A protein has these predicted regions:
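Histidine-centered divalent metal-coordination motifs
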Residues: 15-21, 179, 213
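Short active-site segment of divalent metal-dependent hydrolases/proteases
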Residues: 18-19, 182, 216, 274
Length: 352
C-alpha cells in the first residue's frame, strides 16, 4: 500500500519477472544482446539513484525481488509474466521453478502466470494442460516475436494459436497477456505488431487480452482496437518510466489511453526487474498532465487508484481491504470518452 496526503492506494504490480541472464545461462550471443538491450532501457529511463550495477541486473533472485516489491516498493500483490526465450537461454529467461516456488510460498502476495508457444503443436497443448493444473493458472504471457528454430515470430491469428486459446477457455485461463510493445534486440519489431489482437479479441470474448506496453510504438493502432473491444486492456509496463525522462510523452500516452480505453482497463506495471516499483508508484501518484497539453483532462485520484491496483485486483480476484476499495464499476464502456466534455468535468470523462 502507498499513502500520501491522507490518501491510500492499493498497489498491484501486474507485470514482474524473475530472470537469469548470467553468462552461464546464455545459449549464444543473442542472450547477451537481449539482456544488454534490457539494461539500456533500465539505465536510460531510470533516475540515477535507481540504476543497478550491470552484474546485479543479470540475476536478482527471489529474496531481492521480495524486498524490492513488498518491503521497499509499496506493492500489495504482484503477477509473474515470464518469457521463455529458449533459443537464447539454456534454462530459459524467466525462471519457472524459482518463480513458481516463490509464488507458492507467498500466495497472498504473488500470482504465477506461465507461457506457451503454439509452434510447439500438440505436445505444447498437452504441456499447457499440465501447466494449468500444476500452477492453477489464471493467465499466460505470450511473446509473439520469440524465435523458434527458423521461425522468428508468430501471430495470434495462426490456426495453432486458436487451438491454444480455445484450450485456455476450456481450462479457465481467462487472462491473456501479450507483449505488444518495443522490440528488444535481436527480436523483430513487426512480430510485436498489435494488429492481430483485434481478430482474437472479437473471436474470444470470454478472454481478457492485456496488451503489455500498450502497443508502443503503435499506440494509436492499439487505442483504435481497444476502444471497440471491451475485453482488451492496456498494461503500462515500459510506458511508465517515461514519466521521468519524457513526462510530456508519458502525458500523451496516458491521456490517449484514458480517452480511448478508459480508466477501468489500464493496469500499473513496473516490469520488474527492468525497473523497481517504488519510484514509479511515487511518480505516478504525483503526476499531473502539463498545462500545455490542455486537451487532456487532469488525472483524478480515483483514476489513479484504479490504474495502480484496483483494475488488476478485480481481474485476478485479489482481495482488497474495504477501506481501499471504490464502488463497483459497470461493464467497461467502448468508444472514446468525454468527446463533448471539458477539462473541468474530468471526474465524468472516463467511461465506467
Amino acid at each position: 500500500m502507498y499513502r500520501k496526503d491522507e490518501v491510500s492506494y492499493f498497489i498491484v504490480d501486474a507485470h514482474v519477472a524473475l530472470w537469469d541472464a548470467r553468462p552461464e545461462n546464455q545459449r549464444n550471443i543473442h542472450g547477451k544482446q537481449f539482456i544488454d538491450c534490457f539494461y539500456d532501457y533500465h539505465r536510460n529511463l531510470s533516475p540515477e539513484s535507481e540504476v543497478w550495477p550491470y552484474e546485479e541486473y543479470l540475476y536478482q533472485g527471489g529474496e531481492r525481488l521480495m524486498n524490492d516489491l513488498f518491503r521497499d516498493g509499496y506493492v500489495d500483490h504482484a503477477i509473474f509474466q515470464p518469457a521463455q526465450l529458449g533459443e537464447f537461454y539454456h534454462r530459459g529467461f524467466g525462471q519457472t521453478e524459482e518463480a513458481s516456488a516463490l509464488a507458492a510460498a507467498h500466495p497472498d502476495e504473488l500470482t504465477y502466470n506461465h507461457n506457451f508457444d503454439p509452434r510447439n503443436g500438440e505436445a505444447g497443448l498437452d504441456q499447457l494442460r499440465a501447466d494449468a493444473e500444476r500452477f492453477n493458472l489464471q493467465g499466460v504471457k505470450l511473446y509473439t516475436a520469440e524465435w523458434h528454430g527458423n521461425s522468428r515470430g508468430w501471430s495470434l491469428e495462426d490456426p495453432w494459436a486458436y487451438r491454444y486459446l480455445e484450450a485456455c477457455q476450456e481450462l479457465g485461463i481467462r487472462n491473456i497477456h501479450v507483449h505488444k510493445g518495443p522490440t528488444i534486440r535481436p527480436l523483430d519489431r513487426d512480430s510485436f505488431d498489435v494488429a492481430d489482437v483485434d481478430h482474437v479479441a472479437t473471436d474470444f470474448t470470454e478472454l481478457n487480452f492485456i496488451v503489455e506496453h500498450c502497443g508502443l510504438p503503435r499506440l494509436e493502432d492499439f487505442c483504435w482496437i481497444a476502444t471497440q473491444e471491451p475485453n482488451v486492456h492496456a498494461g503500462l509496463a515500459v510506458a511508465l518510466p517515461f514519466i521521468h525522462t519524457r513526462p510530456k510523452y508519458f502525458a500523451q500516452i496516458i491521456g490517449e489511453l484514458l480517452y480511448w480505453v478508459g480508466e477501468d482497463r489500464i493496469q500499473f506495471a513496473s516490469d520488474y526487474a527492468l525497473w523497481t516499483p517504488r519510484w514509479l508508484v511515487e511518480a505516478f501518484v504525483d503526476f499531473q498532465i502539463p498545462e500545455e497539453l490542455g486537451e487532456y483532462p487532469q488525472i483524478t485520484t480515483e483514476q489513479k487508484k484504479k490504474i495502480l491496483g484496483l483494475n488488476a485486483a478485480k481481474m485476478y480476484d485479489i482481495p482488497v481491504p474495504p477501506e481501499l476499495q471504490l464502488p463497483a464499476a459497470e461493464e467497461p464502456a467502448v468508444g472514446p470518452r468525454g468527446a463533448d466534455k471539458t477539462a473541468e468535468s474530468a471526474d465524468h470523462l472516463v467511461g465506467a
